[in-house]
């Protein structure tokens, strides 16, 4: 190819993050060098997809060359590998933007997440989508010649860098649209300037690319004859994976396709491939990743499926096909019913999309149910990564609330390590005879809820309680009313009624005790005044003297903290003070003649109950003063 003289040549510096990334990548990914070709082919495939899409409305972009392909060649003597595509190409500005910076939100977070552990870092880097920069794993100099479709031949661009902090860029003539990347191999990397080696890498990683990938045909001249003209041959299958029958596709092919679309180095946990025919016609291939992306909780992070219409790529990150709580799902949806000029705005309003969304959501939930049932250990890993996001489900997806609830996992009083492994179905299978409720307790930490006085009566009766300590849990439970016909009960809320789990004698005895302590209830109420909404005898306690319960309609502590943190006004609410009439401290309080001392003891018990509930004291100094006064009296 003849190139004209370079003009407007300048040397620019890489964005800081690129420098760091290059350094890390060259070291972290070195053990799996051959992936550079997969990454570059993946980029070339995206460039061709973009051209196909833009050419629908501007056919002149094809410039008379509608046969789209990728070519990989090599030169043993020059020690180069060249990859060429006739896709959309780049302008000078594109080259500076795409090859000099990482145009992706969350870059700083990504850098913070790098640990120095090679295995973990290579996963993170892969997940971040190193793409083009992987060329520097095997090359000490990379040159890019490109021209964006639709620009003049004189507006080509030549970019080159040694990957050490800066790059050169110049304007050149380039007759053909698209991009050519020339890798000047490092010493010791000559193995890649070889037809068979390159063929094997293409077969291994890029067989699923729905675009012909050509390599020079291996041909030798017969003795005494000239070397024949260069011929090319297609070395990949070049058909869209999701359009092929499932029976013909190997697991390895599904896994490689996932790595291509998910920019991931790990195999997915699970996948679901379906073709729907009838009123709506579409194919879908959905994947559950093995690990959460670092930007899972950033609202602006990229999410959504790749959308194709009749096998023509239309857009990345089409968000309208799955609800937000399934934003970690990767995959492809290919519809026959949408028009090719579909936009994101249209997707949000199209009734066809609503039908597809509900079917795809059900498909994902079925896939997760299957994973939980058949691969409980794998599901445990899934839950660690994505459990908090799944907990957003019941609020967002009313139609599938019961299905999502079945996929949730909790810690409970059955275990002693706080691991969230108990499903609601398991909980009910272990429930006591006559138990028609699912009991739970929310709190800040596992240690706090595990040792909460609210659990005393449940321990005594051997009733399992779910322990919820994620920040989202109280909010989740405001949307989960029941599961399998059994309602949820917060053991710290309202007046605890164990229903059939208390015998008639126990109920009668509790009523009599409450009646006999009416005088004490009034005295404590007068002493605590506005600090409480109510004082009553407790049915929950066996060992502790007192606890604070939450009113039936009041906000719990977790919810109050979330609202306060987001700057919202939180309504005032006062706790209910419950005491254990059989506790020696309460008996002593009941017999106390001095009103001043009675007041001090009541306040100390109230403050201790607040601390046990994980709350902070409104007046810690007053608590310390009362406690010290009591200690002095006891020591006299």
Swiss-Prot record:
Keywords: ATP-binding, Chaperone, Cytoplasm, Nucleotide-binding, Stress response
PROSITE patterns recorded: HSP90 (PS00298)
Region (C): 562-636
Signal peptide from the UniProt entry: none
Subcellular localization, as worded in the UniProt entry: Cytoplasm
Cellular component, GO, one term: cytoplasm
GO molecular-function terms, A-Z: ATP binding; ATP hydrolysis activity; ATP-dependent protein folding chaperone; unfolded protein binding
Ranges for region B: 345-561
Highest taxon listed in the record's lineage: Bacteria
Annotated region described as A, given as residue ranges: 1-344
Main subcellular localisation: cytoplasm
Similarity comment text for this entry: Belongs to the heat shock protein 90 family.
Quaternary structure (record): Homodimer.
Described purpose of this protein according to its UniProt entry: Molecular chaperone. Has ATPase activity.
Name this protein carries in UniProt: Chaperone protein HtpG
């Amino acid at each position: 190819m003849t190139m004209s003289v370079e003009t407007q040549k300048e040397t620019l510096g890489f964005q800081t993050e690129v420098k760091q990334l290059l350094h890390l990548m060259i070291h972290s990914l070195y053990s799996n060098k051959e992936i550079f070709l997969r990454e570059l082919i993946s980029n070339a495939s995206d460039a061709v997809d973009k051209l196909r899409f833009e050419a629908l409305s501007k056919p002149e972009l094809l410039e008379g060359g509608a046969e789209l392909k990728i070519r990989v060649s090599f030169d043993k003597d020059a020690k180069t590998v060249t990859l060429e595509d006739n896709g959309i190409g780049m302008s000078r500005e594109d080259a500076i933007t795409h090859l000099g910076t990482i145009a992706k939100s969350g870059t700083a977070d990504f850098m913070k997440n790098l640990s120095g552990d090679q295995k973990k870092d290579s996963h993170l880097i892969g997940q971040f989508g190193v793409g083009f920069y992987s060329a520097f794993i095997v090359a000490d100099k990379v040159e890019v010649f490109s021209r964006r479709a639709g620009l003049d031949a004189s507006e080509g661009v030549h970019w080159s860098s040694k990957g050490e902090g800066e790059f050169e860029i110049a304007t050149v003539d380039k007759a053909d649209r698209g991009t050519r990347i020339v890798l000047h191999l490092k010493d010791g990397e000559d193995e890649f300037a070889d037809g068979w080696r390159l063929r094997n890498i293409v077969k291994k990683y890029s067989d699923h690319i729905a675009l012909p990938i050509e390599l020079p045909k291996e041909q030798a001249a017969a003795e005494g004859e000239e070397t024949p003209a260069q011929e090319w041959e297609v070395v990949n299958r070049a058909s869209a994976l999701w359009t092929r029958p499932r029976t013909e596709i190997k697991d390895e092919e599904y896994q490689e396709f996932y790595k291509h679309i998910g920019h991931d180095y790990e195999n997915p946990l699970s996948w679901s491939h379906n073709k729907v025919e009838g009123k709506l016609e579409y194919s879908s291939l959905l994947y559950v990743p093995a690990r959460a992306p670092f930007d899972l909780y950033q609202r602006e992070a990229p999410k959504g499926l790749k959308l194709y219409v009749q096998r023509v790529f239309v857009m990345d990150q089409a968000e309208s096909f799955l609800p937000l709580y399934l934003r970690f799902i990767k995959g492809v949806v290919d519809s026959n019913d949408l028009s090719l000029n579909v936009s994101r705005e249209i997707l949000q309003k199209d009734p066809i999309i609503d039908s597809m969304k509900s079917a795809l959501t059900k498909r994902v939930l079925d896939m997760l149910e299957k994973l939980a049932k058949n691969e409980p250990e794998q599901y445990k890993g899934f839950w660690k990564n994505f459990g908090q996001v799944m907990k957003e489900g019941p609020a967002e997806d009313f139609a599938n609330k019961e299905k999502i609830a079945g996929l949730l996992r909790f810690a409970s009083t059955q275990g002693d390590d706080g691991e969230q492994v108990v499903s609601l179905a398991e909980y009910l299978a272990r429930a006591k005879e006559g138990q028609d409720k699912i009991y739970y307790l929310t709190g800040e930490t596992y240690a706090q809820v595990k040792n909460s006085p609210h659990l005393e009566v449940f321990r005594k009766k051997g009733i399992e309680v779910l322990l919820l300590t994620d920040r989202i849990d109280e909010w989740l439970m405001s949307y989960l009313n029941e599961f399998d016909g059994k309602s949820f009960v917060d053991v710290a809320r309202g007046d605890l009624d164990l229903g059939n789990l208390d015998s008639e004698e126990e109920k009668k005895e509790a009523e009599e005790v409450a009646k006999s302590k009416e005088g004490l209830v009034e005295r404590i109420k007068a002493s605590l005044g506005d600090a409480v909404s109510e004082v009553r005898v407790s049915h929950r306690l066996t060992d502790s003297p007192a606890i604070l319960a939450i009113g039936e309609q009041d906000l719990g502590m977790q919810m109050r903290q979330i609202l306060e943190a987001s700057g919202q006004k939180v309504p005032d609410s006062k706790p209910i003070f419950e005491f254990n009439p059989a506790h020696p401290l309460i008996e002593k309080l009941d017999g106390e003649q001095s009103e001043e001392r009675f007041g001090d003891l009541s306040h100390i018990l109230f403050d201790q109950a607040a601390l046990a509930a994980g709350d902070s004291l409104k007046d810690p100094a007053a608590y310390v003063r009362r406690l010290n006064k009591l200690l002095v009296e006891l020591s006299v």
